[in-house]
């Protein structure tokens, strides 16, 4: 609660209170996440849209999703409460790759790549990664200031890659990194996931491993006129800056 949910909720409450106090803010773009949309019991092969909410997230089963959906609810309730509110849009990125600006950025979405390039994991696990480039996320935020619907909800997702695909791409483009080649069998990954990452519990593994989920980002393409860097390009273009930052 204190580490994940409270910072998101209290921080968002502070932001909207500051907007009201200032009285001069005309446009507000709230950075949310696909985690605010993805329910716990999604179906393999399902495509999700912004019509869905992660309202089944709890502190026990999905604290990050709870943090994101709670913060967005605060924003939307505030926005609908009375006249004179600024224009408001929410942006929902998936896993964000692309060149990092500082070492702290390697602790988030790029930890997936960092684990590969530093060979923190000897074998690969059978998992799909939904990807968007950080530069596209930034562009979507700028466009949402003046484009799209007031109160709009926009997914920013360029595509997806299997973890094994990502590792293969890195081996092809940066052979000196010697990223892992072999995948661990599903059943072993299912029961021994914490050996690869302490965050991989049995329930999480059962929900995500060897399953695919897709996202409909066409509203952002249509209403924000977005086009996307390919997932592969985002992977490849992430690495040089990671090397420059001294993490590889």
Which role fits each region the language model picked out?
Residues 11-14, 70-71, 133-136:
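Conserved cofactor-binding/catalytic machinery of classical short-chain dehydrogenase/reductase
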Residues 2-62, 89:
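Conserved Rossmann-fold NAD(P)-dependent oxidoreductase catalytic core, especially the SDR/UDP-sugar
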Residues 1, 55-61, 102-103, 110-132, ...:
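A conserved pocket-lining segment of Rossmann-fold NAD(P)-dependent short-chain dehydrogenase/reductase
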Residues 82-86, 98-111, 144-154:
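Glycine/proline-rich active-site loop of Rossmann-fold NAD(P)-dependent oxidoreductases
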Residues 21, 58-89:
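Active-site Tyr-X1-5-Lys
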Residues 140-201, 222, 231-248:
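Mid/C-terminal beta-alpha module of Rossmann-like enzyme folds, strongest
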Residues 163, 204-217, 235:
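Active-site loop of classical SDR/Rossmann-like NAD(P)-dependent oxidoreductases
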Residues 36-37, 96-98, 137:
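Conserved sequence/active-site signature of Rossmann-fold short-chain dehydrogenase/reductase
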